[in-house]
Structure formats: structure tokens, C-alpha cells
Amino acid sequence: MKKESKGTKYKQRTISVWNEVAPFYHKRWAKNEVGPFGVTKKLLELSKIKKSDTVLDLACGTGLVTKKLIRKVGSKGQIYAIDSSESALKIAKKWTGDAKNLHFIRADAEKVQFETKFDAITCQYALFFFPNEQKVLKNMKKLLKKDGTITLAVHGKYNVPYFDCILESVKKFIPDYLPKYPEMDRFGTKETFADAIKKAGFKKIVVKKFVFKYSPGTFSDYWNNYKKHLSKPLKEKFDSLTKFQKVNLREMIKDKTLEYTKKNGKIVFPWEVLVLTAKN
């Protein structure tokens, strides 16, 4: 029997997690474009997608970018939206409506093929999930028309305390809390982001930085919501901590949030996002 590769196992685990968390992700984040999801408008502006364009929304998730593309390309354009999570696609199909020029497909971004060529490809908050991003990027190149455009968004590496306050603390108690492969922040600077795209053969690469604000409420809101919506693999690791460890962890995280806590007790985090455009 052929042994599964590290990348294959990671992809299977990621699909399983997204099938579990997609409903919460959509309700809490994507649906209302809160915090970093304010970047969707910027991404579409920078993409310069026009009426009648044929566009691929790669790793479309629950359909935030996809839904806005319907108006962007108009009735004469075509939109193809792919994702590997059945749960996310189910939400996207229901939320975006039944436009005749919109096509949802469950597919692997590394391998998906189309008879048509695309004027543009969008990919918001997904590139870092791919264990072999070069396979995905090179497949994008094959799918694009000559001089077609890609527009990608990723979280910044250094100014996203929403994640760091919790994760850096948790890893002190559970060193293997998150998988080391792939590194989720590996495109989090302008240089590393541009280098990865250049390596895949794209040209005219431009990276812009945006900083949004997000409030998870009070510290109790932030902490309790995090615990409530952990995926099954992370919950199992978290639950392995003793009561004493959990108390210490909570205090450690609370200390990290103090610089972002306002007088009314609400936390307001900055959230850095990078948006890249490039030509085929």
C-alpha cells in the first residue's frame, strides 16, 4: 500500500477541520465582513476585474469574494468557485443565490483543470493553507489567459495580535498545539509573499499592506469564544491541560491583551493584511 505523504495527510486534516468550522466561520467572520474581512473590497478593487470577465475564485470558502464577483462581472461574465470543503461550498451555494453564470466545484487547487482560460483568479486567506503553494501557483498560471491577473490576500506576520496573544501563550503549555507544516505565516511579509509568487513565474508583482481593526468584545468574550469554537483536534489538546494550567494560561493571555484593551473593557486588535496582484 502506498504510504500517504505529509502533504496528503495535512490536506485531509484541513478539509476535515473546515467541514467542522465553516458554519461558525461564516456567521462570525465572512458574512458580516468584520475585521480582516474588510479587505474583500480592497482585493476586488485591486484586481481590476471588469464586466464580462471570466473569473476563478480559488479556495472560495463560504463565498464572500464569490458573491461580490457576481455584480463585478455582470450577467455576461462567468464565475467559477472552487473549494475542497463540502461544508463551506454548501454554505456558499445557499448564500450567493442561483446566478446562472456562477459555478461551484469541489476540487483540489493543485490539480483542478478547466477547458476555459481565466481573465483573473482571486484567492483570499487560503494560500498559506496549501502545503505546496508552488503547485497551486503554477496551476493558476496554467489556468490564466496571457496577461491574466491574480489577486491574493494573506494575514500579516507581525501585526495580528488576535492570533498571537492566544497561540504564543498556548504553545508554551502545548508545544505541538499547531502543526509545524506548513508554516502559516510564511507569506506574512511583503518580501516573502512577493518571492513566492515570483518563483512561480508571475510578473508585475505589487504587494500592498492594509491594517484593519477587530474587537472580539471583552477579554472574557475573547477567551470563551476561542474555547467554544475550537476544532476537534485542538480541543482534545486543550482539554489535556490541568485546571491549574488552564488558569495560568488564561492569565498569561489576559496580560498580553492589556495593551489593546480600552477603558470600557473592550479589546480592539489591529489586523495587518497583505494583498498581492501579479500578471501571468
Where are these regions (language model features)?
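Short glycine-dipeptide loop
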Residues: 52, 75-76, 144-149
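Class I SAM-dependent methyltransferase SAM/SAH-binding core
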Residues: 54-112, 135
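A short SAM/SAH-binding and catalytic strip from SAM-dependent methyltransferases
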Residues: 120-133, 156
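A short acidic, Gly/Pro-enriched loop at the edge of an enzyme's catalytic core
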Residues: 110-121
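Class I S-adenosylmethionine-dependent transferase superfamily signal
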Residues: 69, 140, 278
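Conserved Class I S-adenosyl-L-methionine
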Residues: 3, 7-10, 28, 33-37, ...
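Conserved class I S-adenosyl-L-methionine
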Residues: 2-50, 64-68, 88-91, 95, ...
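Conserved catalytic/acceptor-binding region of the Class I
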Residues: 134-135, 149-217, 263
